[in-house]
């Protein structure tokens, strides 16, 4: 299983977050750098994958409410795609 631990320090703004996610999650070149596109890409993952999300992502002042929305998208995608696991630590 591929395990990816997200680094909150790399998520300094919404554009930086999407750039980081594109790299960290090896998202396709057509990734649209928004939460809808992220959901689409995550539900298409075919390799067993675990994403470890820092627990304080929802309290991050640089991301604001977007951190909460990101976590929700990750969790929703994991519900849809049985080989994707999202763990909050």
Give the label of every model feature segment.
Residues 1-89:
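Positively charged, polar, low-complexity stretches
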């Amino acid at each position: 299983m591929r395990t990816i631990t997200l680094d909150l320090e790399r998520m300094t703004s919404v554009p930086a977050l999407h750039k980081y996610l594109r790299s960290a999650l090896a998202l396709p070149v057509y990734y649209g750098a928004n939460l809808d596109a992220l959901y689409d890409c995550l539900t298409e993952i075919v390799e067993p994958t675990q994403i470890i999300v820092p627990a304080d992502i929802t309290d991050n002042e640089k991301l604001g409410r977007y951190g909460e929305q990101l976590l929700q998208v990750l969790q929703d995608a994991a519900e849809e795609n049985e080989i994707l696991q999202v763990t909050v630590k």
